[in-house]
Curated annotation (Swiss-Prot):
InterPro entries: EFG_II, EFG_III, EFG_III/V, EFG_IV, EFG_V, EFG_V-like, EFTu-like_2, G_TR_CS. One of its GO terms (cellular component) is cytoplasm. Keywords: Cytoplasm, Elongation factor, GTP-binding, Nucleotide-binding, Protein biosynthesis. Belongs to the TRAFAC class translation factor GTPase superfamily. Classic translation factor GTPase family. EF-G/EF-2 subfamily. The gene is fusA. One of its GO terms (biological process) is ribosome disassembly. This is Elongation factor G. The keyword RNA-binding does not apply. GTP binds at residues 15-22, 86-90, 140-143.
Length: 694
C-alpha cells in the first residue's frame, strides 16, 4: 500500500561528534519497530554504523538511509513513513553532512545537554541554513552530570542566531532526571523503565515546576500568535488557544524557518525519543510542503518540478557506496514522477542513459527489494555505471539538471605504495572505487616518482581510506608522510657551451652545442628555439638536443625538483661526420643545460595556498598570530554571522597539522578552507634546508 505524500518525512539526524546522535537513531528504529534489540554504540553494535571502522572508532562516517513507520505515541496519527539519513559529525566528513542536507526536507539536530552548542554543530547549522532546511532540536543526555537544558536553549539563540521555542521542560536533571513536561498538553510524561520506555503515562505536573511551566507555555502562545491575525486577536483578548491551533501555527513557523521547536530527554535512558518522533510528524515538512525543486533544462533555462507522481521523473544521486554483496549502490532522492525497475533514465549531467536494474530500500544495512520508487522517496539503485555524487537522473524526453553540489578541493596528499607486487593492481581498483564514492577524495600518479598519491580533506579522512582499502579490498599499503611539491626556476640569462667527446679506438662520440638559457615569466612554461644557421648541426640531430635539455629539467639542478618557466635557444655548435650521433648530442644538450643553469641563479619555488579562516572574534588574535608564524601574509578580513573571516596566503609546507592546531587554539570553533594559489620563490633559509635534505 503506497503511503500518500503528505505522510512522508525525509529527515536527517545531525549533531556534533558524541552528542549521542547514533544512539538517538537506534532508539528511533527500536520504537518504530524496525529493530528488535537496541544496539549500543559503545558495544560496537549500532545498526546504522555498519562499516567496521565506524564500530571500532565509535563515530559515524557514512550516512546510511533507513525507512521506518510511526503513528504517534498515543497512536494519534495515520501511519507516517519516515526516511532517516544518519549523518557524521566529524569535521573531515563535513562533505557527507552537506550531501545529506541537500536531499532532506527537515532535520533533527541533537545537542549534548552538558557540552551545549559545539563547533561542529555551528557548522552543521550553517549548512542547514544554506539549504534552508527546517529543523527541530533534541537536547540529549539530560541524565549526565552537569546537564543544563536552559543553557543550551540560550546558546541556540546567541551562538546560532535562531529562535528556539521550548516545547518540553525536563523533570530533574543528572541522575534525578525523571521525565519531561509537555508544555502544550501541560502534562508530565513518565516513561516505563521496565520495557525500555515502550510504554509511558501522563501525570500531573509537579507543584514546584508549575510556575516555570506557565512561563514557558506563555512563550509558546506568544510565538504561535504570530502565525495569523485570528490567533493574534485571540491572544490580545486573552482567550485560550486549542492544542490544534498551537500545533498548526508552530508547524507553519518551523517549516518557514522562523522558529526551532526544542525537545529534551535521554536517548540512552530511553526517555524522550518518542516525543521527538511525534515532533517530526507534527512540525517537519512532508515533500509536498517544500518549494518545488528548481533546475535547468538542456537549453539552460530555469524550470520547476512539483513533488507529484504525475510529473516527469527526476531524482538527485547523493551518495555512491560499495556494498560487499550487491556491488555499487547509488542512493538517490526522487523529487517528481515514478521510477520502476527496468526503466531507462537519463543522467543529464553526464549526458548518458542508464538502465535501472534492482531498486532497494535500505534499513541501515539490511535491504528490501522494491518494484518502484515514487516522488518524495529515498532509495538505492544497484549497478549504475556513469552516476557520481550530485548527478541528476531524469526522464529521457523531459530533461532537467537539478543543481550540482559543490565539493571543496582536497588539501592534503600522501604517497601510498602497495606492500607487494600482487597488491599493485588491487590497489588501483580499490582506490578507483573509493574515489567514485567520495568526491572529496582524489587519486593520481606522480609522473616524476611514479608513486600513487592520494589526496583528501584531512589526516583522519586519509587514514580511514587506507583502512578501508585494507579491510574491504585486502590491500596492504605503506603510507608516506604528507608531501609538498616544490619546483625550481632560473633568474638570470646565460650563454653556455657544452661538449661531449669520447675517443676510445673505433667509432667515438662527438656532440658540441652553444645554448642561450633565459628565465620566462611565471606560468609560461618551457620554450625551445632552434637558431642554427648554415647547418653547423644537421637538422636531424636538433630534436635530440631538445630532448636532452628536457630530461635534465625534469631532474632539476639544485634540489632534484623540476625546472619550470625557461626559454632555451640553440644558436651554435659543431658536429663530426663519423662520431656525431643523436645520443652524443642529447648528452651534450643535457650537460650544457645543467652547467648553464647553475650559473643562471637557480632558485627554489614553493606552492602557496589561499587560506580562509572563519573564527569567532574572541580567537581572532590567536589565529592571526599563528598565521604570521606560518609565514602567512594576511590579505584581508571581513565580518560574517559566524564571526570574522581572515584571508591569507600561506606556504603549503607550513600548513601540515593546521586543522588540529586550529581546533585546539579555538576549541574547535573556527573552520578553514584552503586551495592552491601560486608558486613563489622560497626564502633563502627555507630553500637551503630543503636543498641540504636532497
Amino acid at each position: 500500500m503506497a503511503t500518500p505524500l503528505k505522510l512522508y518525512r525525509n529527515i536527517g539526524i545531525a549533531a556534533h561528534v558524541d552528542a549521542g546522535k547514533t544512539t538517538t537513531t537506534e532508539r528511533v528504529l527500536y520504537y518504530t519497530g524496525m529493530s528488535h534489540k537496541i544496539g549500543e554504540v559503545h558495544d560496537g553494535a549500532a545498526t546504522m554504523d555498519w562499516m567496521v571502522q565506524e564500530q571500532e572508532r565509535g563515530i559515524t562516517i557514512t550516512s546510511a538511509a533507513t525507512t521506518c513507520y510511526w503513528s504517534g505515541m498515543d497512536k494519534q496519527f495515520e501511519s507516517h513513513r519516515i526516511n532517516i539519513i544518519d549523518t557524521p559529525g566529524h569535521v573531515d566528513f563535513m562533505i557527507e553532512v552537506e550531501r545529506s542536507l541537500r536531499v532532506l526536507d527537515g532535520a533533527v539536530v541533537v545537542f549534548d545537554s552538558v557540552a551545549g552548542v559545539e563547533p561542529q554543530s555551528e557548522t552543521v547549522w550553517r549548512q542547514a541554513n544554506k539549504y534552508g532546511v527546517p529543523r527541530i532540536v533534541f537536547v540529549n543526555k539530560m541524565d549526565r552530570m552537569g546537564a543544563n537544558f536552559l543553557r543550551v536553549v540560550s546558546q541556540i539563540k546567541q551562538r546560532l542566531g535562531s529562535t528556539p521555542v521550548v516545547l518540553q521542560l525536563p523533570i530533574g536533571a543528572e541522575e534525578e532526571f525523571k521525565g519531561v513536561i509537555d508544555l502544550i498538553k501541560m502534562k508530565a510524561i513518565h516513561w516505563d523503565e521496565e520495557n525500555k520506555g515502550m510504554t509511558f503515562k501522563y501525570v500531573d505536573i509537579p507543584a514546584d515546576l508549575k510556575a516555570t511551566c506557565e512561563e514557558y507555555r506563555a512563550h509558546i502562545i506568544e510565538a504561535a500568535a504570530e502565525y495569523s491575525e485570528e490567533l493574534m486577536e485571540k491572544y490580545l483578548e486573552g482567550e485560550e488557544f486549542t492544542e490544534a491551533e498551537i500545533k498548526k501555527a508552530l508547524r507553519h513557523l518551523t517549516i518557514t524557518n522562523k522558529v526551532v521547536p526544542v525537545f529534551c530527554g535521554s536517548a540512552f535512558k530511553n526517555k524522550g525519543v518518542q516525543a521527538v518522533l511525534d515532533g517530526v510528524i507534527e512540525y517537519l515538512p512532508s515533500p509536498t510542503d517544500i518549494p518545488d525543486i528548481q533546475g535547468v533544462d538542456e537549453h539552460g533555462d530555469e524550470i520547476h518540478r512539483k513533488t507529484s507522481y504525475d510529473e516527469p521523473f527526476s531524482a538527485l544521486a547523493f551518495k555512491i557506496a560499495t556494498d560487499p554483496f550487491v556491488g555499487t549502490l547509488t542512493y538517490f532522492r526522487a523529487y517528481s514522477g515514478i521510477l520502476k525497475s527496468g526503466d531507462t533514465v537519463y543522467n543529464s549531467v553526464k549526458g548518458k542513459k542508464e538502465r535501472i536494474g534492482r531498486l532497494l530500500q535500505m534499513h541501515a544495512n539490511s535491504r528490501e527489494e522494491i518494484k518502484e520508487v515514487r516522488a518524495g522517496d529515498i532509495a538505492a539503485a544497484v549497478g549504475l555505471k556513469t552516476v557520481t555524487t550530485g548527478d541528476t537522473l531524469c526522464d529521457q524526453d523531459k530533461v532537467v539538471i537539478l543543481e550540482r553540489m559543490d565539493f571543496p578541493d582536497p588539501v592534503i596528499a600522501v604517497a601510498v605504495e602497495p606492500k607487494t607486487k600482487a597488491d599493485q593492481e588491487k590497489m588501483g581498483i580499490a582506490l578507483g572505487k573509493l574515489a567514485q564514492e567520495d568526491p572529496s577524495f582524489r587519486v593520481h600518479t606522480d609522473e616524476e616518482s611514479g608513486q600513487t598519491i592520494i589526496q583528501g580533506m584531512g589526516e583522519l579522512h586519509l587514514e580511514i581510506i587506507v583502512d578501508r582499502m585494507k579491510r574491504e579490498f585486502n590491500v596492504e599499503a605503506n603510507v608516506g608522510k604528507p608531501q609538498v611539491a616544490y619546483r625550481e626556476t632560473l633568474k638570470q640569462a646565460v650563454e653556455q657551451e657544452g661538449k661531449f667527446v669520447r675517443q676510445s679506438g673505433g667509432r667515438g662520440q662527438y656532440g658540441h652545442v652553444w645554448l642561450k638559457i633565459e628565465p620566462q615569466e611565471p606560468g609560461k612554461g618551457y620554450e625551445f628555439i632552434n637558431a642554427i644557421v648554415g647547418g653547423v648541426i644537421p637538422k636531424e640531430y636538433i630534436p635530440a638536443v631538445d630532448k636532452g635539455i628536457q630530461e635534465q629539467m625534469q631532474n632539476g639542478v639544485i634540489a632534484g625538483y623540476p625546472v619550470v618557466d625557461v626559454k632555451v635557444t640553440l644558436f651554435d655548435g659543431s658536429f663530426h661526420e663519423v662520431d656525431s650521433s643523436e645520443m652524443a648530442l642529447k648528452i651534450a644538450g643535457s650537460q650544457c643545460f645543467k652547467q648553464g643553469a647553475l650559473k643562471a641563479k637557480p632558485v627554489l619555488l614553493e606552492p602557496i595556498m589561499s587560506v580562509e579562516v572563519v573564527t569567532p572574534e574572541d580567537y581572532m588574535g590567536d589565529v592571526m598570530g599563528d598565521l604570521n608564524r606560518r609565514r602567512g601574509l594576511v590579505q584581508g578580513m571581513e565580518d560574517s554571522p559566524a564571526g570574522k573571516i581572515v584571508r591569507a596566503e600561506v606556504p603549503l609546507a607550513e600548513m601540515f597539522g593546521y586543522s588540529t592546531d586550529l581546533r585546539s587554539a579555538t576549541q574547535g570553533r573556527a573552520t578553514y578552507t584552503m586551495e592552491f594559489c601560486k608558486y613563489a620563490e622560497a626564502p633563502t633559509n627555507i630553500a637551503e634546508a630543503i636543498i641540504k635534505k636532497q
